[in-house]
Amino acid sequence: MLSKQELLTEHINELRKDYVVKPRLEYTTIRAVNGPLVILGDVRLPTFAEIVNIELSDGTMRRGQVLEVDGDKAVVQVFEGTSGIDVMRSKCEFTGKVMELGVSEDMLGRVFNGSGIPIDDGPPVLAEQYRDIQGIPINPRARVYPEEMIQTGISSIDVMTSISRGQKIPLFSGAGLPHNEIAAQIVRQAGLVRKEGKQEDFCIVFAAMGVNQETARFFRTEFEENGSMEKTVLFMNLANDPTIERIVTPRLALTTAEYLAYDCGKHVLVILTDMSSYADALREVSAAREEVPGRRGFPGYMYTDLACIYERAGRVLGRAGSITQIPILTMPNDDITHPIPDLTGYITEGQIYVDRQLHNRQLYPPINILPSLSRLMKNAIGEGMTRRDHSGVSNQMYARMRLDDILAMKAVVGEETLSSEDLLHLEFLEKFEKKFICQGFHESRDVFQSLDLCWQLLRIFPKVLLNKIDVKTRNEFYDGQPMRC
């Protein structure tokens, strides 16, 4: 026998069954199509960021988003491109909703396109929640300072530019450099230094924007073959996909990361490549809207737009998870003063610099440690985090790497005229590049192995020259066996 409440619920469900309500208005008032934009007139109460469904004359459906509202006019950016839109016969439906993504832990191990639609022949994702892809700003008072290290397995990153959980640190690269290989290696090897919890507490969200078919195939094959796919969510926007879709892709990735981090308690590493393609998409939309251009044609609000992406990294008070961002960008003509790396450097907390000269000398990974920097490194290393000699070893390695004067003197007067100390520096530099920086694509070194390798190199010098390391630590590690502490 059903209770009154159960009978009422059953009655309501029966009334709702097969009952279609369509309160939305459809418009056929497209005034113009300009690049990726559709301009509509006579629209009743359009809303900024509202999602618009566009039905073409052949029945094909496309999605767009309101970019600008002026009275009864609305400018809509179409994610799938405007090719084939007939001004006279296409219909536009304003949904009254912002763009949302259905998120779930089932997204791990899945591949999506740049609009968040599965492309791996798997079933649709059963959403636990629907989230606005623009995210919600984190209250600065609720932020927790990043103090624990993420281990990448690459010595030049782990020792010299250590990455904290919750940090945002970009990879500055150039066309033709192996940043894709470095990204794939980080995905395969990344983990937590101190594995207090279970291994599944760590996962990766990878978003590719504007990549070609070969690069997309490389990433998918690499992740599937090395077994990291089961802990990875992959968003792929290809070069032949609509440019406008690239504006949405990183936001979908970060919305997924926020759910996995703050609702599921996971430590999420987000890798975004290539942010230069994202900035080019911003410029294309800005040009179509006939906005006043800024430096090199990029919109004046690009700094704000990039900050809306990068600032979604971090840790939140009372939440177990964290979001760490490694955006990858290719500097046009290797110019670090270009607006994209320039503005990125202002927002983020350091950078990892991929060097063309090291790459031309067949060194992999070609990471130049001198222009590289991690501003949050000091709180993520040391006793209880990695090892107590980490900070001193890193400072000493940097100090011994500054050899511009010695190399210039060697080029002018020859090696024979150099002092014995200068010769030690040259020996150190040669072994530093061959043993420390140079590392195989499938070679993973934990931070303790990398620190031990540093001590092997520092023993080239007499103990008294290692003045960046405190005396107690220097005596223990220079003479004795390295230990984990």
Swiss-Prot record:
Keyword annotations: Hydrogen ion transport, Ion transport, Transport
Q: Does the keyword NAD apply?
A: no
Which SUPFAM superfamilies does UniProt cross-reference here?
P-loop containing nucleoside triphosphate hydrolases
A single cellular component GO annotation: proton-transporting V-type ATPase, V1 domain
Does Transport appear among the keywords? Answer: yes
Matching entries from Pfam families are given as:
ATP-synt_ab, ATP-synt_ab_N, ATP-synt_VA_C
Q: How does the record describe its quaternary structure?
A: V-ATPase is a heteromultimeric enzyme composed of a peripheral catalytic V1 complex (main components: subunits A, B, C, D, E, and F) attached to an integral membrane V0 proton pore complex (main component: the proteolipid protein).
The protein's role, per its UniProt record: Non-catalytic subunit of the peripheral V1 complex of vacuolar ATPase. V-ATPase is responsible for acidifying a variety of intracellular compartments in eukaryotic cells.
**Protein family per UniProt:** Belongs to the ATPase alpha/beta chains family.
Task: Indicate what this protein is called per its UniProt record.
Answer: V-type proton ATPase subunit B
Source organism per entry reads Trypanosoma congolense
Q: What is the lineage of its organism?
A: Eukaryota, Discoba, Euglenozoa, Kinetoplastea, Metakinetoplastina
